[in-house]
Amino acid sequence: MVGRRALIVLAHSERTSFNYAMKEAAVAALKKKGWEVVESDLYAMNFNPIISRKDITGKLKDPENFQYPAESVLAYKEGHLSPDIVAEQKKLEAADLVIFQFPLQWFGVPAILKGWFERVFVGEFAYTYAAMYDKGPFRSKKAVLSITTGGSGSMYSLQGIHGDMNVILWPIQSGILHFCGFQVLEPQLTYSIGHTPADARIQILEGWKKRLENIWDETPLYFAPSSLFDLNFQAGFLMKKEVQDEEKNKKFGLSVGHHLGKSIPTDNQIKARK
């Protein structure tokens, strides 16, 4: 789509990797459709993933009792965050779509990407308790995870030894991305890439490029709207009583995280509602 901007965040150290090939395919496909594409190749940038006092360039509010969340929020408001954090925040602000390309490591994101989230998604910039989830600062933006795994798809199935991929994705897609407001699109899952032959890899890359041609028009994944909850500390941010009563006799819960003690909706974190 002409006029749109995309940010691709890559978390893989090797240019010969399939993750790098997926990133390159995304750049080519989006540019072909008129997108402006910016990259954050975290390993190539030697991005520092460790939060510390060095993230604040100005005077600390309480150096004797340093608390990173409070100090980083103040530094953001006063313009005293370190330049590398500010640079990434500017990329995010300009982006309509953010693609995260990485290998699944220990059932989560690589450490360097986790550090990127921790340092860049500063309070007041990426979230507040008054504006989170579908009311979050990034609510007009879309995000998609493009993940490779070592294990096969069956290993991440309901009966698989690793357990349901939907459960693995929830902390990332809901706890990080949607928490900050992102409309999260269906993840691009590439299973068992180390055991995938060359011809099949080419097909995967072509399928990814094909999907990206119309990715802006895709339906986001479903997350329980914040309007279903009492959004204040006195009420405990709990689901409203009338909503609980309404959902009581339904077969499935609302989502992976809001299962309400019932069966999880099938592929809640993998497929958008039709």
Curated annotation (Swiss-Prot):
EC class: oxidoreductase
One Gene Ontology CC term in the entry: cytosol
Gene Ontology MF term list: identical protein binding; NADH:ubiquinone reductase (non-electrogenic) activity; NADPH dehydrogenase (quinone) activity
Subcellular location: Cytoplasm, Cytosol
Cofactor: FAD
Database matches in SUPFAM superfamilies: Flavoproteins
Entry annotated with the keyword NAD: yes
Alphabetical list of InterPro entries matching this protein: Flavodoxin_fold, Flavoprotein-like_sf, NAD(P)H_dehydrogenase_qn
Keyword Flavoprotein: yes
Residue numbers spanned by region Important for apoenzyme conformational stability: 225-274
Catalytic activity: a quinone + NADH + H(+) = a quinol + NAD(+); a quinone + NADPH + H(+) = a quinol + NADP(+); ubiquinone-10 + NADH + H(+) = ubiquinol-10 + NAD(+); menadione + NADH + H(+) = menadiol + NAD(+)
Entry-annotated residues carrying Phosphoserine: S82
Keywords recorded for this protein, A-Z: Cytoplasm, FAD, Flavoprotein, Isopeptide bond, NAD, NADP, Oxidoreductase, Phosphoprotein, Ubl conjugation
One Gene Ontology term from the biological process aspect of the record: ubiquinone metabolic process
Covalent link Glycyl lysine isopeptide (Lys-Gly) (interchain with G-Cter in SUMO2), residues: K250, K251
Binding site for FAD: H12, F18, N19, Q67, L104, Q105, W106, F107, T148, T149, G150, G151, Y156, R201
Record-annotated membrane-spanning stretches: none
Amino acids binding substrate: A126, Y127, T128
Enzyme Commission (EC) number: 1.6.5.2
Assembly information from the UniProt record: Homodimer. Interacts with PDLIM4 isoform 2; this interaction stabilizes PDLIM4 isoform 2 in response to oxidative stress and protects it from ubiquitin-independent degradation by the core 20S proteasome. Interacts with TP73 (via SAM domain); this interaction is NADH-dependent, stabilizes TP73 in response to oxidative stress and protects it from ubiquitin-independent degradation by the 20S proteasome. Interacts with TP53; this interaction is NADH-dependent, stabilizes TP53 in response to oxidative stress and protects it from ubiquitin-independent degradation by the 20S proteasome.
Known function: Flavin-containing quinone reductase that catalyzes two-electron reduction of quinones to hydroquinones using either NADH or NADPH as electron donors. In a ping-pong kinetic mechanism, the electrons are sequentially transferred from NAD(P)H to flavin cofactor and then from reduced flavin to the quinone, bypassing the formation of semiquinone and reactive oxygen species. Regulates cellular redox state primarily through quinone detoxification. Reduces components of plasma membrane redox system such as coenzyme Q and vitamin quinones, producing antioxidant hydroquinone forms.
Family: Belongs to the NAD(P)H dehydrogenase (quinone) family.
Full protein name: NAD(P)H dehydrogenase [quinone] 1
Gene expressing this chain: NQO1
